[in-house]
């Protein structure tokens, strides 16, 4: 009996210790300060904040929380591109929008490429963030904020700069694949690609301090062949 009590005491102390470490506040956004009762002995644990645009809040874009005060401008030195993963061909159109076409049920993988040219006086960003979102889904109950009836595996990311991609040797970039698939009821749609190039770290509970960033938006047209 004595040994069982000792074992139980060790387990309880271990859980308390782990939850004490987890419970440290790691929020940049005060509106996401929520606690949840853990299934283990009812001890509260804290959530770290997730992306706020249209997911946990009805914020229309990144600037609801972050400052648009970075040195990167919407000029030829800034790279925001979407490539066909197989051909590496840019899907950018003459009007500056992007066009992604695929058949119903067929998967299409693209590369999101973000960064800036090396041969200029503007420093490289440290971290790039991006989000593909259908603005019409913000404020609605749908869990997915991508175009309705389109499957997607990676609609958002926050990535350190330093990826290598043929054709972009003269730039500091991030590059990640995203696969989409129009389902049976999918229709043509227009979504928004929201991008931030950033340096520094945001201050806890105040995402407008400590981090500099430049915000950009691009229109992306999804076409069912």
Residue ranges and their predicted role:
Residues 9, 34, 38-42:
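Intrinsically disordered, low-complexity segments enriched in polar/charged small residues
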Residues 9-15:
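Bacterial N-terminal signal peptides
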């Amino acid at each position: 009996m004595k040994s069982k009590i000792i074992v139980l005491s060790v387990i309880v102390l271990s859980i308390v210790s782990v939850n004490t470490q987890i419970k440290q506040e790691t929020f940049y956004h005060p509106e996401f300060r929520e606690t949840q009762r853990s299934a283990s002995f009812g001890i509260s644990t804290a959530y770290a904040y997730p992306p706020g645009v249209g997911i946990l809040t009805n914020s229309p874009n990144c600037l609801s929380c972050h400052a648009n005060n970075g040195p990167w401008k919407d000029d030829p030195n800034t790279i925001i591109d979407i490539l066909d993963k197989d051909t590496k061909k840019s899907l950018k159109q003459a009007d500056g929008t992007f066009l992604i076409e695929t058949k119903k049920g067929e998967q299409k993988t693209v590369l999101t490429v973000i960064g800036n040219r090396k041969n200029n006086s503007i420093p490289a960003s440290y971290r790039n963030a991006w989000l593909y979102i259908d603005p019409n889904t913000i404020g609605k109950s749908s869990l997915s904020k991508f175009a309705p009836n389109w499957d997607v595996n990676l609609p958002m990311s926050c990535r350190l700069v330093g990826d290598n991609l043929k054709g972009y040797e003269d730039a500091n970039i991030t590059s990640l694949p995203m696969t989409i698939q129009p389902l049976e009821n999918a229709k043509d749609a227009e979504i928004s690609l929201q991008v931030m190039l950033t340096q520094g770290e945001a201050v806890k509970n105040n995402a407008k301090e400590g981090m500099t960033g430049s915000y950009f938006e691009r229109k992306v047209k999804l076409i069912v062949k």
